[in-house]
Swiss-Prot record:
Name the UniProt record assigns to this protein: Ribose import ATP-binding protein RbsA 2
Catalytic activity: D-ribose(out) + ATP + H2O = D-ribose(in) + ADP + phosphate + H(+)
SMART domains noted in UniProt: AAA
Cellular component, GO, one term: plasma membrane
Domain ABC transporter stretches: 13-249, 266-513
The keyword Electron transport is annotated on this UniProt entry: no
CDD domains: ABC_Carb_Monos_I, ABC_Carb_Monos_II
């Protein structure tokens, strides 16, 4: 994707010598950045490299910083995001800033609602405008539905629609595909190309390097708060980008030891999960088994029901779940997550920040929470053995290489990769028989991913049964021994790893309605 010289000369935004410090940390260190009109500029780097902080400065989230910002040649300093938006800069943050109890349309037009001559909000007009935005994005979302009732991927599309509604000159996308599937990603890329053709610019942050090579014109690499590389995308390959991002070459990215697979340890039969109104099956009669030392991968597109399947097994939806669960050949009854934990089942959820961690608690207390529930560190009279608690946490901080100043650090202050290690540590501490992993590497950098893969491999070698949901085909193929495919809540296929290709998995994952449409077009 070569930029023409005209666009190359037209600088839309320039940030000069930007430095941003937090107590004890230089998050952005003397970074200069140019954004050209009508380009897609990728910004890459590990978690903690300073990417999101730099973008929040450009978008007015952080008004206090050193350096200068020029927009179309004029110096600007935004005091808040609204000022940035009024000047044509929109940010889609990694952590979505949506209001759960408002509808998707109300979120899109929050504080910008269409009103009549009397100042009364014209809801019908707002719903129609939201529908047009969703149609442009190629997604089927009811503009009247509350955000809290939408899936994570649908919420992501609402955030993207909100940014498009601002008609910005520069749209900053921070990990926009971390929670959406392949089809939605392709649609988003089409939108990005349209924006580019309109002369608008996109700053695109992603850990998925294959996306960078597909959509970007230019790439900027950050490490430890500094800019360490920059240039047209044609000047980079995967290895060069990784080397710049982590400061060294990664010879082996997917670390999968060959574990000894023995007896069946876990089986589910006829799992069903009904919607809240009990009119629709979100999971429809799914059965599978896992053996000791085995990693069972579950692949599917967004809306396939994979997350719902794991949650149903874990007892997260009592009253709406049917089916049987067996551990070691013995049927167990799970009516709540507590029942699952007591029977040796752990769940690493897709959204670690809201479902996997208590962000305002320390690393120590997050790691030992299930151990307290299981009374593994509780002495007589219900008192916690604080010495044992500290020893357990220190051992996991060391074993999992969790980068934290101390066990008492608030977990919200850790990087995404280290937060995910804390979630894994809290389950490993109770020595589960089965661990359910839902998108275990979502939103974390390449180095942290490699460490998570190593941990998953070690779990399998130890004899644990591992069930791993992933939307990343290279990941599912590299880490799984067997792969189950889901579509529209149903199990559609099952493969041995050595007998399947990416094409096989995608074919099995496409919903039947889409397959029919595709066949008709071909005819």
């Amino acid at each position: 994707m070569m930029l023409n010289t005209e666009k190359e000369r037209e600088v839309l935004l320039e940030a000069r010598n930007i430095t941003k410090t937090f107590p004890g940390v230089i998050a952005v260190n003397n970074v200069t950045l140019q954004i050209y009109k009508g380009e897609v500029c990728a910004l890459v780097g590990e978690n903690g490299a300073g990417k999101s902080t730099l973008m929040k400065i450009l978008a007015g989230v952080y008004p206090d910083y050193e350096g200068q910002i020029f927009l179309e040649g004029k110096e600007v300093r935004f005091r808040n995001p609204r000022e940035a938006q009024e000047n044509g800069i929109a940010l889609i943050p990694q952590e979505l800033d949506l209001v759960p109890n408002l509808s998707s349309a109300e979120n899109i037009f929050l504080s910008r609602e269409p009103v009549n001559e009397f100042g009364v909000i014209e809801y019908q007009k707002m719903f129609e405008q939201a529908s047009k935005l969703f149609s442009k994005l190629g997604v089927n979302i009811d503009p009247k539905t509350k955000v809290e009732d939408l899936s994570t991927s649908q919420q992501q599309m609402v955030a993207i629609a909100k940014a498009l509604s601002l008609d910005a000159k520069i749209i900053i996308m921070d990990e926009p595909t971390s929670a959406i599937g392949k089809r939605e990603t392709e649609q988003l890329f089409n939108i990005i190309r349209s924006l580019k053709n309109e002369g608008k610019s996109v700053i695109y942050i992603s850990h998925r390097l294959e996306e960078i090579f597909e959509i970007a014109d230019r790439v900027v690499v950050m490490r430890d708060g500094r800019k360490v590389g920059e240039g047209p995308i044609e000047e980079f390959d995967h290895d060069k980008l990784v080397r710049l991002m982590v400061g060294r070459s990664i010879d082996q990215f997917f670390i999968k030891e060959r574990a000894t697979i023995t007896d069946e340890i876990f089986r589910v039969e006829g799992i069903k999960l009904w919607s809240l109104d009990r009119k629709k099956l979100l999971v429809d009669d799914v059965s599978f088994y896992v053996r000791k030392g085995e990693v069972l991968g579950i692949y599917g597109l967004v809306g396939a029901g994979r997350t719902e399947l794991l949650e149903a097994i874990f007892g997260a939806h009592p009253g709406r779940t049917e089916g049987k669960v067996f551990i070691g050949g013995k049927e167990i009854k799970i009516h709540s997550p507590r029942d699952a934990v007591k029977n040796g089942i752990g769940l690493v959820p897709e959204d670690r920040k809201t479902a996997g961690l208590i962000l305002q608690m320390s690393v120590l207390h997050n790691i030992t929470l299930p151990s307290v529930v299981m009374k593994l560190i509780v002495r007589k009279f219900g008192l916690i053995d604080s010495q044992l608690e500290k020893e357990i946490v220190r051992s996991f901080i060391e074993k999992l290489n969790i980068k934290t100043p101390s066990p008492y650090q608030i977990v919200e202050n850790l990087s995404g990769g280290n937060q995910q290690k804390v979630v894994l540590a809290k389950w490993l501490a109770i020595k589960p028989k089965v661990l359910l992993l839902d998108e275990p590497t979502r939103g974390i950098d390449v180095n942290a991913k490699s460490e998570i893969y190593k941990l998953i491999s070690e779990m399998a070698v130890s004899g644990m049964g591992v069930v791993m949901v992933s939307s990343e085909l290279p990941e599912i193929l590299a880490m799984s021994d067997r792969i189950l495919v889901m579509s529209e809540g149903r199990k559609t296929a099952e493969f041995l790893r050595e007998e399947v290709t990416e094409e096989d998995l995608l074919k099995a994952a496409i919903p039947r309605s889409v397959k029919v449409e595709t066949t008709q077009r071909e005819e």
